[in-house]
């Protein structure tokens, strides 16, 4: 579950660097990025694809649900933002409860301040919550790597 919540300032490029650090160790994964920040989504996708991974993307939870429900081969991992228009990350997680998508490990990437209810919900519904404000870049890479090791 998503037991650890850390929040210290970090820039997007450090988050991206941490993802790049980890994905260097992993290739041939199918990864779905659900993120409304187009620049961040594009950059992370580019990094993941350069490492030999197959990346699908969606700009909100509704778009992701439509795409994932059409997929025959589901992704190995989902990177999910929480604060998005149309359908946010919490709504996405609620919508997938009784679907095949529920079995996919989900890493939440968020800059949001979470209250105890949010933390409790995410702990039960996701592998890990990684704050976009997380100061420990290495821990971000390690968490993604840990999920990959456990699942594949």
Predicted regions and their residues:
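Charged docking surfaces used in two-component/phosphorelay signaling
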Residues: 42-50
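C-terminal output helix
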Residues: 10-19, 47, 118-121, 133-148, ...
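Short, glycine/charged-rich "phosphate-handling" switch motifs in NTP-dependent
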Residues: 3, 127
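Active-site residues of response regulator receiver
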Residues: 81, 110
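Acidic, metal-coordinating helix/loop segments flanking the phosphotransfer/catalytic sites
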Residues: 57-77
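Acidic catalytic/metal-coordinating carboxylates
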Residues: 60-63, 88-94
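Receiver (REC) domain active-site loop signature in two-component systems and cognate sites
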Residues: 84
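Conserved acidic carboxylate
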Residues: 35
């Amino acid at each position: 579950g998503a037991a650890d919540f850390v929040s210290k300032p970090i820039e997007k490029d450090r988050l991206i660097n941490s993802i790049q650090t980890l994905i260097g160790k992993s290739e041939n994964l199918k990864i779905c990025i659900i993120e409304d920040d187009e620049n961040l989504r594009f950059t992370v996708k580019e990094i993941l694809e350069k490492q030999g991974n197959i990346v699908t993307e969606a700009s909100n939870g509704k778009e992701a649900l439509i795409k994932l429900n059409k997929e025959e081969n589901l992704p190995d991992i989902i990177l999910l933002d929480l604060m998005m228009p149309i359908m946010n990350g919490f709504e996405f997680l609620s919508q997938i409860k009784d679907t095949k998508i529920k079995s996919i490990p989900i890493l939440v990437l968020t800059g949001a301040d979470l209250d105890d209810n949010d933390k409790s919900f995410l702990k039960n519904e996701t592998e890990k919550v990684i704050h976009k404000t997380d100061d420990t870049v290495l821990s971000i890479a390690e968490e993604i790597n840990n999920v990959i090791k456990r699942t594949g």
